């Protein structure tokens, strides 16, 4: 059977494969379009398998939030190069995969691979995409968070697709939840930029805090040596690094020290109640450096750096007429924990021709 240019064009458009590959597949299939598609898929899958030993450390972080802000999904799909990450077909693949994960309630990569998308087993669909796009692609990780009637979730992905965040909040009422969606998205934007590791100091491991506190003091003392040499003001050396180190006894000790300071300054006791709260707030600010670095609630808000996220949430709760509490936080940064493979180009060429 004669293979026409129109047949090649049609097969190419339906599969995304190269022109010569389409022409050859049609020849092998004697012009049968369906058989030609199968032949290309078989060859494509073979090519995809060969690509699977190449590290995929570029790619995209994708976020999908349902219209009512009750469910949000974040995924990381890796490619080998940032060039492919900018490919509209790859971007569509990331978006479709994330939406499929959410709509199907998929929890694991194993579940994803055995699921069905557009009538095709996802694993087969994804390998076909690998063959068409021409690089190894990997669905590395994903997570979905959800909320009940009194909750709200939202998400944000930075414009370069390298960082994405989901945040979920429990609210005092459904009315507050409905009004809080945009605020939660703003918190996601903050977290994308400021990289908190956990929601609160309560989520930090105490042994980790103690080790970090020792390192922090050493860091500040070292810097103070240089500042002293230059005749510049020295850093304050904190007594603590996190609120998880400050219990009732520590707070009582700090309060007593403030009272003694006020007494030494000759401040009348009748005005201490007006002064002490501000000094306690300063005490916390000076002694929670680790919280400010690592916890969402302890960080100063990027849109108002005079207030912590915790303070901003309290203000928003009053504004909306009910309590808002952050209960879920997920942040993906592209390639976290992956080492980017550095290829020996000469060895790769030798392997291809040998």
Curated annotation (Swiss-Prot):
Subcellular location: Cytoplasm
Record-level Gene Ontology MF annotations: translation elongation factor activity
Keywords: Cytoplasm, Elongation factor, Protein biosynthesis
A Gene Ontology term for the protein's cellular component: cytoplasm
Primary location: cytoplasm
Domain of life: Bacteria
Keyword Protein biosynthesis included in the entry's annotation: yes
Region (Involved in Mg(2+) ion dislocation from EF-Tu): 81-84
PROSITE patterns reported for this sequence: EF_TS_1 (PS01126), EF_TS_2 (PS01127)
InterPro entries registered for this protein in UniProt: EF-Ts_dimer_sf, Transl_elong_EFTs/EF1B, Transl_elong_EFTs/EF1B_dimer, Transl_elong_Ts_CS, UBA-like_sf
Family: Belongs to the EF-Ts family.
HAMAP family from the UniProt entry: EF_Ts
Functional note: Associates with the EF-Tu.GDP complex and induces the exchange of GDP to GTP. It remains bound to the aminoacyl-tRNA.EF-Tu.GTP complex up to the GTP hydrolysis stage on the ribosome.
Name of this chain's protein: Elongation factor Ts
Species in which this protein is naturally found: Campylobacter concisus (strain 13826)
């Amino acid at each position: 059977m004669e293979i026409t240019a129109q047949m090649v064009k049609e097969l190419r458009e339906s599969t995304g494969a190269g022109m010569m590959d389409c022409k050859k597949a049609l020849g092998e299939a004697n012009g049968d379009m369906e058989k030609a598609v199968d032949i290309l898929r078989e060859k494509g899958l073979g090519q995809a398998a060969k690509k699977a030993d190449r590290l995929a450390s570029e790619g995209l972080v994708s976020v999908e939030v349902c219209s009512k802000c009750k469910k949000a999904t974040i995924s990381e799909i890796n490619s080998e190069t940032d060039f492919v990450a900018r490919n509209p077909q790859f971007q569509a693949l990331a978006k479709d995969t994330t939406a499929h994960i959410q709509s199907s309630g998929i929890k694991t990569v194993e579940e994803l691979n055995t699921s069905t998308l557009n009538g095709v087993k996802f694993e087969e669909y994804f390998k076909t995409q690998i063959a068409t796009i021409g690089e190894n692609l990997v669905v590395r990780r994903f997570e979905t968070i959800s909320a009940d009637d009194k909750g709200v979730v939202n998400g944000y992905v930075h414009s370069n697709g390298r960082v994405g965040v989901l945040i979920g909040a429990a609210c005092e009422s459904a009315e507050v939840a409905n009004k809080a969606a945009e605020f939660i998205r703003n918190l996601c934007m903050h977290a994308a930029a400021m990289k908190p590791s956990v929601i609160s100091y309560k989520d930090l491991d105490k042994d980790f805090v103690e080790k970090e506190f020792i390192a922090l003091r050493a860091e500040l003392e070292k810097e103070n040596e240089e500042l002293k040499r230059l005749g510049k003001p020295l850093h304050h050396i904190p007594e603590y690094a996190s609120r998880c180190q400050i219990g009732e006894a520590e707070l009582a000790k700090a309060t007593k020290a403030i009272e003694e300071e006020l007494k030494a300054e000759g401040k009348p006791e009748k005005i201490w109640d007006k002064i002490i709260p501000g000094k306690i707030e300063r005490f916390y600010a000076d002694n929670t450096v680790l919280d400010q670095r690592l916890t969402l609630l302890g960080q100063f808000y990027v849109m108002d750096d005079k207030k912590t996220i915790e303070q901003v949430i309290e203000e928003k709760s009053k504004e909306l007429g009910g309590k808002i509490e952050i209960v879920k936080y997920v942040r993906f940064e592209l390639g976290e924990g992956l080492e980017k493979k550095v290829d020996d180009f000469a060895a790769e060429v030798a392997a291809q021709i040998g």
